[in-house]
Amino acid sequence: MIQPQTYLNVADNSGARKLMCIRVLGAGNSRYGFIGDKIIAVVKDATPNMAVKKSDVVEAVIVRTRHHIRRDSGMTIRFDDNAAVIINKDGNPRGTRVFGPVARELRDKNFTKIVSLAPEVL
């Protein structure tokens, strides 16, 4: 459950390390974002000399949440951290690598490029 003011780790090599959510997109009028939802975020911590700088406003997709996900099979899954991948306007990731596992629900929401870059899909 990601809401405005939530801090997230960045799961790619775009140059940002920490994001703060400022708006949840694509969730209707809901206050919370879940895996596969797009968010507008501000970069709070970044690696020097990279494409993404501190205080940049970026669009990202949530790939991991500490809040559990219930699947149709009855299984629940949760991750150790809240994480997002920075994307461009076309929905493609700005980085060239994705770190850590991502949820299978991203494939259903047409983020296949992120799923293909991830080392593990749960």
UniProtKB/Swiss-Prot annotation:
<dbReference type="GO" id="GO:0022625">
    <property type="term" value="C:cytosolic large ribosomal subunit"/>
</dbReference>
<keyword id="KW-0687">Ribonucleoprotein</keyword>
<dbReference type="Pfam" id="PF00238">
    <property type="entry name" value="Ribosomal_L14"/>
</dbReference>
<protein>
    <recommendedName>
        <fullName>Large ribosomal subunit protein uL14</fullName>
    </recommendedName>
</protein>
<dbReference type="InterPro" id="IPR019972">
    <property type="entry name" value="Ribosomal_uL14_CS"/>
</dbReference>
<keyword id="KW-0694">RNA-binding</keyword>
<dbReference type="GO" id="GO:0070180">
    <property type="term" value="F:large ribosomal subunit rRNA binding"/>
</dbReference>
<dbReference type="GO" id="GO:0006412">
    <property type="term" value="P:translation"/>
</dbReference>
<keyword id="KW-0699">rRNA-binding</keyword>
<comment type="subunit">
    <text>Part of the 50S ribosomal subunit. Forms a cluster with proteins L3 and L19. In the 70S ribosome, L14 and L19 interact and together make contacts with the 16S rRNA in bridges B5 and B8.</text>
</comment>
<dbReference type="InterPro" id="IPR005745">
    <property type="entry name" value="Ribosomal_uL14_bac-type"/>
</dbReference>
<dbReference type="GO" id="GO:0003735">
    <property type="term" value="F:structural constituent of ribosome"/>
</dbReference>
<dbReference type="InterPro" id="IPR036853">
    <property type="entry name" value="Ribosomal_uL14_sf"/>
</dbReference>
<dbReference type="InterPro" id="IPR000218">
    <property type="entry name" value="Ribosomal_uL14"/>
</dbReference>
<comment type="similarity">
    <text>Belongs to the universal ribosomal protein uL14 family.</text>
</comment>
<comment type="function">
    <text>Binds to 23S rRNA. Forms part of two intersubunit bridges in the 70S ribosome.</text>
</comment>
<keyword id="KW-0689">Ribosomal protein</keyword>
